[in-house]
C-alpha cells in the first residue's frame, strides 16, 4: 500500500522511542534464533572480554558481538568462514547479531587457508630442521599441556606408569573452542618461565573434526612452540590429522600415547639395552687389554733381547777398549823409543857434545861457524872454542 492510496488519518503515528522499541521487538520476535553464514572480518577484542566483529559475504556486511563468557567451539579468526547461531538485537538504532554458537563452514576454504598459512610459516623458516631441538635421552620431568579431564590425560599417565615412571606436571587447558589456542600459548610460556622447568613438553588432545582441531592451527601458537627453549612434542588428534603445531614442534607424535613412547624409553628394554651395551663394552675392554698385553709381551721380549745384545756389545766394547789401550801403550812406547833415539842423534851433533868429547869449534870474525877451509883467507882472524875456553888465532896461509 502506498501513501497515496490511503488517507493520512489511517497511518499510525509513533514517537522515535516507540518505533525503535517496536522494531526491536519485531526483530527479537522474528529473529530470536537464527543461523547466519559469513566470513569473519574486522575482529576486535577489547579489554572487556567481549568480541566484536563483522560477518560478510560478497554483497553485504552485518555487525556481530559475542559477549564475554559465551563458550564457543571455534576460535574467532579473520578470514574464517563460519555459521553463527544467535539472535538479532538492536543497539543505538542499529541491529547486530548476538552470537551464541559458531561452527566452521566450507572445509575446502579452510583447507586452502590452512595450506596458505603453512607455506607462509615454512617460507619464514619456522619449520626448518636446523631449529629443531633434540629430545633428552631420559627426561626426569615431563610437562603435559592438555585437558585435565578426559581419556587423553588418563592414557598419558597410564602409559608413563607402565613405560618409565617419571614426574609429570599437567598444565590444564581447553583443547577446543575460542580460548584453546591462547591457553596453550600461555601454558608453553608458563613452562618455559618456571625456575625448574620440565625436560620436555607434550601438547596433546584426542581426535576430532577440523573444527575441533582448528585452535592448533593458530599462527601465534606455532610461533610460540617454535620459540620454546624446552623441546616440544605435538600429539594432536589421530595419525592422519595434521595441524600447524605439528610442523612447528620439535617432534610430531601420531597419538598422545605414542608421544609418551617417543619421550620415554621402556624401562625393561632400557635396562636390557644398558646391560647389552655394558657387555659389549666389557668385551671390547677385554679385547683391548688382551691385545695390549700381547703387545707388551712382544715388547718385553724385544727389550730382553735388546738388553742381551747391549750386554754383548758392552762386553765387546770393553774388550776392544782394553785392546786399544794396550796397542796405544805399545805404540806410545815405540814412539818414545824413537824419540829417545832421535834426541840421542841430535845430541851427537850438538856443539856442547862435540866440544865435550875433545873437538873444537871455529868461528870467523863475525861469529859464524866455519865449516870449511875455503870459508877463511890468509890474515883472517878466527876464534877457536874448546870445552875449557876460547882463543883468537890468525890464518897464515
From Swiss-Prot:
- What sort of enzyme, by top EC class, is this? hydrolase
List the EC numbers from the record: 3.1.11.6
| NCBIfam families (alphabetical) | xseA
> What Pfam family does this protein match (any one)?
tRNA_anti_2
Its localization reads: Cytoplasm
Its primary localisation, in coarse terms, equals cytoplasm
Q: What is this protein called?
A: Exodeoxyribonuclease 7 large subunit
Keyword terms of this UniProt record: Cytoplasm, Exonuclease, Hydrolase, Nuclease
Q: Which GO terms describe its cellular component?
A: cytoplasm; exodeoxyribonuclease VII complex
Q: Write out the catalysed reaction.
A: Exonucleolytic cleavage in either 5'- to 3'- or 3'- to 5'-direction to yield nucleoside 5'-phosphates
Q: How does it assemble?
A: Heterooligomer composed of large and small subunits.
Q: Which InterPro entries match?
A: Exonuc_VII_L, Exonuc_VII_lsu_C, OB-fold_nuc-bd_dom
Q: Which domain of life is it from?
A: Bacteria
The function of this protein is:
Bidirectionally degrades single-stranded DNA into large acid-insoluble oligonucleotides, which are then degraded further into small acid-soluble oligonucleotides.
Family recorded in the similarity comment:
Belongs to the XseA family.
Q: Which GO terms describe its biological process?
A: DNA catabolic process
Question: Residues of the signal sequence?
Answer: none
UniProt organism field: Anaplasma marginale (strain Florida)
A molecular function (GO) term = nucleic acid binding
Amino acid at each position: 500500500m502506498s501513501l497515496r492510496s490511503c488517507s493520512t488519518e489511517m497511518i499510525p503515528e509513533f514517537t522515535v522511542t516507540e518505533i525503535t522499541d517496536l522494531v526491536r521487538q519485531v526483530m527479537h520476535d522474528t529473529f530470536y534464533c537464527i543461523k547466519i553464514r559469513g566470513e569473519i572480518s574486522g575482529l576486535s577484542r577489547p579489554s572487556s572480554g567481549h568480541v566484536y566483529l563483522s560477518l560478510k559475504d560478497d554483497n553485504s556486511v552485518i555487525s556481530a558481538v559475542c559477549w564475554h563468557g559465551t563458550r564457543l567451539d571455534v576460535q574467532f579468526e579473520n578470514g574464517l568462514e563460519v555459521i553463527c547461531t544467535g539472535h538479532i538485537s538492536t543497539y543505538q538504532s542499529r541491529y547486530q547479531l548476538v552470537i551464541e554458537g559458531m561452527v566452521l563452514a566450507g572445509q575446502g576454504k579452510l583447507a586452502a587457508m590452512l595450506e596458505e598459512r603453512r607455506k607462509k610459516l615454512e617460507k619464514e623458516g619456522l619449520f626448518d630442521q636446523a631449529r629443531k631441538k633434540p629430545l633428552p635421552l631420559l627426561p626426569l620431568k615431563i610437562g603435559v599441556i592438555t585437558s585435565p579431564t578426559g581419556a587423553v590425560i588418563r592414557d598419558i599417565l597410564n602409559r608413563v606408569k607402565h613405560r618409565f615412571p617419571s614426574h609429570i606436571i599437567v598444565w590444564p587447558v581447553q583443547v577446543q573452542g575460542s580460548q584453546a589456542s591462547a591457553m596453550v600459548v600461555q601454558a608453553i610460556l608458563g613452562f618455559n618461565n618456571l625456575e625448574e622447568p620440565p625436560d620436555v613438553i607434550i601438547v596433546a588432545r584426542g581426535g576430532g573434526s577440523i573444527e575441533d582441531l582448528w585452535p592448533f592451527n593458530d599462527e601465534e601458537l606455532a610461533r610460540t612452540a617454535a620459540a620454546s627453549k624446552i623441546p616440544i612434542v605435538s600429539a594432536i588428534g589421530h595419525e592422519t590429522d595434521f595441524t600447524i603445531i605439528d610442523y612447528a614442534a620439535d617432534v610430531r607424535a601420531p597419538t598422545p600415547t605414542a608421544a609418551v613412547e617417543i619421550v620415554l624409553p621402556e624401562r625393561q628394554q632400557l635396562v636390557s639395552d644398558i646391560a647389552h651395551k655394558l657387555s659389549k663394552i666389557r668385551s671390547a675392554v677385554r679385547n683391548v687389554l688382551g691385545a695390549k698385553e700381547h703387545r707388551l709381551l712382544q715388547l718385553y721380549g724385544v727389550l730382553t733381547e735388546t738388553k742381551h745384545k747391549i750386554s754383548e756389545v758392552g762386553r765387546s766394547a770393553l774388550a776392544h777398549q782394553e785392546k786399544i789401550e794396550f796397542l796405544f801403550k805399545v805404540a806410545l812406547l815405540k814412539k818414545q823409543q824413537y824419540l829417545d833415539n832421535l834426541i840421542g842423534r841430535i845430541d851427537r851433533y850438538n856443539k856442547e857434545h862435540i866440544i865435550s868429547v875433545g873437538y873444537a869449534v871455529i868461528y870467523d870474525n863475525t861469529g859464524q861457524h866455519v865449516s870449511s877451509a875455503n870459508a877463511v883467507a890468509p890474515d883472517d882472524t878466527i876464534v877457536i872454542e874448546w870445552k875449557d875456553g876460547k882463543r883468537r888465532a890468525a890464518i897464515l896461509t
